[in-house]
């Protein structure tokens, strides 16, 4: 009996400690850790390119000092830029995230689990991104369309 309890306990422990997202077995597309890590690193680089002060802030501080103060145009621009980046990384699979709720939730859960990478901002890439960001932001400011 004790041996059975020990075996069940070990199995439960290993299952509980699994790093894989298992809540969405019917997801049509399951983004890989490698893809999510690449997305997080690139997005963090781009955010810190535009908002260098993010490098020293916790998420709560960043929310209070940066994200909560973004204009609607800035939010729209970040939505566009982050979606475009994800589409560049996963290609045609991006359609699954738009159309399949389980695939989208799988991505969100995996993103939340892996989002702890530090940015490594490349000055040349940053300059190019800033131009792109500013250009789209100007267009978003002039748009009276819904979010």
Language model: regions and residue ranges:
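Hydrophobic alpha-helical membrane context
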Residues: 15-16, 135
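N-terminal cationic leader/targeting segments used for protein routing and processing
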Residues: 4-5, 113
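Bacterial signal peptide processing site
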Residues: 18-20
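Short N-proximal segments of mature Sec-exported proteins
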Residues: 24-93
């Amino acid at each position: 009996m004790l041996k059975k309890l020990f075996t069940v306990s070990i199995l439960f422990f290993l299952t509980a400690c699994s790093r894989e997202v298992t809540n969405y077995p019917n997801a049509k597309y399951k983004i890989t850790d490698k893809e999510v890590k690449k997305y997080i690193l690139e997005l963090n680089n781009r955010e810190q390119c535009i908002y260098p002060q993010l490098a020293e802030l916790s998420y709560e501080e960043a929310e209070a000092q940066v994200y909560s103060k973004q204009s609607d145009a800035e939010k729209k621009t970040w939505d566009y830029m982050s979606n475009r980046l994800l589409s560049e990384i996963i290609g045609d699979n991006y359609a699954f995230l738009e159309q399949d709720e389980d695939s989208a939730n799988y991505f969100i859960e995996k993103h939340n689990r892996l989002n702890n990478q530090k940015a490594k901002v490349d000055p040349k890439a940053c300059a190019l991104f800033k131009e792109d960001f500013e250009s789209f932001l100007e267009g978003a400011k002039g748009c009276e369309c819904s979010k």
